[in-house]
Every structure is written in structure tokens, then in C-alpha cells.
Amino acid sequence: MAQQEIPAASFGVVGGSGTVSSDFPARLPDEDIEILADNLIFDTPYGKSPAFRLFAVGEVRALSCRMHGWRSGVTRADASRQVFWVFREAHVVRVLSESGVGTANHLLDPRDFLIPDDYLDLSNRKDVMLDGRYLLIMRDALCPELRASLLAATKKHFSGRIFDRGIYACTDGRHFESPAEVAMLKGCADIIGQSICPEVYLAREIGACYAGLYYVVNYGEGIRPKWSYGTMKDIFYDDAPMIGEVLAETIRETAAKERHCECLALRKETLLKDVYNEASDKG
């Protein structure tokens, strides 16, 4: 049954494949984490939302959903709209996302972390917006301040290789990329995934900071002779609690900081006022 009132939260967490097996954040050992409400489903202009969890890290409230809101019978574009419409109504100002990714850069290996500073949108999910009233300038689309917090939290909980910049190439999926597609991306991108777009656009549209933590789970086809499905499976199940710890630590350490980034300032009123001259019925 859909809820009518959307609770306020300052953080949004878009869970991905890195935490899908861990029931984030319910099983984390942190004493300051409290589940406040569960299985919250809201009516949105784009259909019923995915189930959200409301939780607190200390005094900071966050809303999270699993697997980017993707589910059967709902397009990925609408799933993203539903998630970010709820975030907007909840007054979320910082959004964290995570997922497993493949490699385009031959220097990366499974179990490397990358916190990208830019992206390439190769998906077909174009024109995914909430109401179109803003001109979205995508400079520093991945918030430098939130990325720095993610980096510090990852270093605290992970002793492996962490890269604090790189380019994420977004494809449609759900299949993985062919060797020719990966070859095309070599030299243009470092990692390949399916979720950063349209999330990064929608975060800017609602005026929120956005950053992502991406865990390498496989080599892109042709980067190495073969990659192991068994390794990917082990990563999904064995490393999920650690990824959850990183996200919780990032919320804990970022919450007290004021925003000094440009994320909100880079959302401008549209110049096409004859087209978008008032809020839409989905705004």
C-alpha cells in the first residue's frame, strides 16, 4: 500500500549491486545506525515508487532504495524518476550511489575501487527529467566535496587500491558489452556500468550533490582473455558489508559539513520560458 507522506531526509542512498546482498544498512555493526521505517512505497507522477528504507546515522536521516529502483515491469527511466522525485519531496541534498562495474582501462583489476569525476552517457535513456524547468550545467557533475568524503571513508574501511578520479561510461544493458564496444571505450573511459545516467542528471535537477562508489567486479571483454563469474559472485556476497560501512561512514562524516560546492548553483532557470513557463503536473 502506498504511503502518502514522504519523510524528510538529508541523504539519499541509491543502492546497487554492491549492497544488494547485505540488506543495507540493517546488518551493519554500527551502534548509531537505526532503522526508522521500512518498505515505504509512495505514489509518484511516474507510478508507484520502489520500496524505500528510512534510517538514521546518528542524528542524520537518510532514505535508501535497492538496485537503483529497478524492477520488473518498470522502465529504468521511470524507476530513476520515481527515486529522485521521492528524494526531491524529502528535501534530500546529498545523494550517494554505488554499483559493481566492468573495466575499460587495462590497468584496473577486480576489487579495485574507483570514485569517478566524470562520465560518458552512451545510454538511450535520453530526455529523462522531472519537469524540465532547469538548465543543467554538468561541470563537476560528481560533487568534489562528496567524492572527497567517499574517498576518506573508503580508505578507512578498505586496504586495497582506490582511485579518486576516472571516467564512467554508461551503457544501457542489461547485457554486458561486446569486445568491440569495450575496444571503442578504451582510452575514453576507465569503467563501464549502467546506472550513473540518468541519476547524475536528476540529482542536479533536484539541486542535490551526487557522487558514486564503484567496485570493479569484472574485466571488460577483450581487456583480459577471460574473467571469472565465480569471482564476481564472491565479490557481491563477501564484500557487500564493507561497502555498506563505507556509505554509512560517508554519511556520518559529511553530515556536519556545510556545502561549499557549486552543485546547486549549476542548476539554472531555463531560458526556454515559452516552453517551460510553469511547473508541470509532474513537478
Residue spans for each PLM region:
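Metabolite-binding pocket within alpha/beta catalytic cores that recognizes anionic/polar moieties
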Residues: 1-138
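Active-site/ligand-binding-proximal alpha/beta "capping" segment
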Residues: 153-190, 264-283
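Non-catalytic positions within long, well-ordered alpha-helices that form the structural scaffold/packing
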Residues: 87-91, 186, 204
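Generic non-transmembrane alpha-helical segments
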Residues: 145, 149-160, 245-253
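Short acidic/polar active-site loop segments enriched in Thr and Asp
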Residues: 93-94, 190, 209
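His/Asp/Glu-rich mid-to-C-terminal helical/loop segments that flank catalytic regions of hydrolases
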Residues: 221-272
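Zn-dependent metallopeptidase/amidohydrolase metal-coordination segment
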Residues: 194-232
